[in-house]
């Protein structure tokens, strides 16, 4: 897996675009209508995001956002007083976010296309780095976290959303339900009975290409089960995993949100995502250069630390 494959996928499949019908398809390149529809969908489905952002003091802070999507959180951060700069791997996302911010006359410091593996800013440039749903798509996350540490000022922090290992989506939907459903559908892949299920059809094509057993291996299937069957890379995190993969930081706060486990109808149950939510929000404080991590602490029972620690 290389960065160009990841860049190509996200350039062709901007995050969330297809869910509201597509900027170039349903909305005929009408950016304002598209952004309005996208934001309405996003903050209905993920209504916790504004409240989670409110737990951090952004005002007057130099903030770098890594991975921009459609710019929904970019706008939220700027409206909360952040001195915002943005970085995305794809030209498509950079263009969309630039259009959004210009149309809404929102001030910002900088917006660049580039890689988290080689962040195009000088050392000690930012007070905070924010990344929502991006770093779990970076294979070389150790290099990425070192680069984030480099551009943070002493005392800076990374606030990130990572896909949660201990979630209903991963432990039940991905590991059990979806793999079992795909195995059951596999004998029907040439029958023509699945023509109206394009996502399942793509999974079956993937499985036929590499072999069903290999495709259903969890290390393979996870990549293809978080952001569509063409997504090249994804991983899931516990708090222990976050400590391991971000050794330049100290994990000081964590919280889970967003009960999401398709095809299970969990939204109808009105359950909290606090224990089995798909989104693991973490605050990681940059360690001083001379203070390496002291091993990886054991995983502990879940507590909603993010709401209890001053951010």
Would you name each region that the model predicts?
Residues 1-35:
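N-terminal, positively charged/glycine-rich alpha-helical extensions of SAM-dependent methyltransferases
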Residues 157-209:
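Conserved class I S-adenosyl-L-methionine
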Residues 62-64, 70-118:
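Class I SAM-dependent methyltransferase SAM/SAH-binding core
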Residues 232-254:
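Short alpha-helix
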Residues 142-154:
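A short glycine-rich, Lys/Arg-flanked "PGG" loop and its adjoining helix->strand segment in the class I
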Residues 30-61:
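Conserved alpha-helix/loop element of class I SAM-dependent methyltransferases that forms part
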Residues 267-311:
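Core SAM-dependent methyltransferase catalytic element
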Residues 117-128:
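A short acidic, Gly/Pro-enriched loop at the edge of an enzyme's catalytic core
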């Amino acid at each position: 897996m290389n960065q160009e494959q990841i860049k190509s996928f996200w350039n062709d499949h901007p995050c969330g675009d297809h869910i509201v019908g597509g900027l170039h398809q349903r909305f005929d390149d009408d950016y304002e209508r598209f952004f309005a529809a996208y934001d309405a969908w996003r903050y209905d489905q993920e209504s916790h995001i504004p409240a989670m952002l409110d737990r951090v003091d952004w005002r007057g802070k130099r903030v770098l956002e890594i991975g921009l999507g459609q710019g929904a959180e970019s706008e939220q951060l700027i409206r909360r007083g952040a001195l915002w700069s943005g970085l995305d791997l794809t030209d498509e996302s950079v263009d969309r976010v630039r259009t959004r911010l210009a149309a809404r006359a929102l001030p910002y410091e900088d917006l660049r296309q580039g890689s988290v593996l080689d962040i195009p800013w000088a050392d000690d440039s930012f007070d905070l780095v924010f990344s929502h749903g991006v770093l779990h798509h970076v294979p070389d996350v150790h290099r990425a976290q070192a680069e984030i540490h480099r551009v943070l000022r002493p005392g800076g922090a990374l606030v990130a959303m990572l896909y949660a290992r201990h979630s209903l989506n991963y432990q039940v939907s991905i590991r059990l339900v979806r793999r079992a459903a795909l195995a059951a559908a596999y004998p029907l892949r040439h029958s023509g009975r699945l023509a109206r299920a394009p996502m399942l059809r793509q999974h079956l094509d993937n499985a036929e290409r590499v072999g069903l057993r290999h495709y259903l291996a969890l290390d393979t299937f996870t990549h293809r089960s978080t952001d569509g069957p063409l997504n090249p890379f994804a991983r899931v995190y516990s708090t222990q995993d976050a400590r391991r993969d971000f050794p330049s930081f100290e994990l000081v706060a964590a919280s889970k949100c967003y009960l999401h486990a398709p095809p299970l109808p969990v939204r109808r149950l009105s359950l909290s995502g606090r224990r089995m939510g798909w989104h693991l929000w973490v605050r990681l404080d940059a360690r001083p250069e001379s203070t390496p991590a002291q091993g990886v602490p054991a995983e502990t029972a879940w507590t909603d630390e993010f709401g209890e620690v001053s951010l």
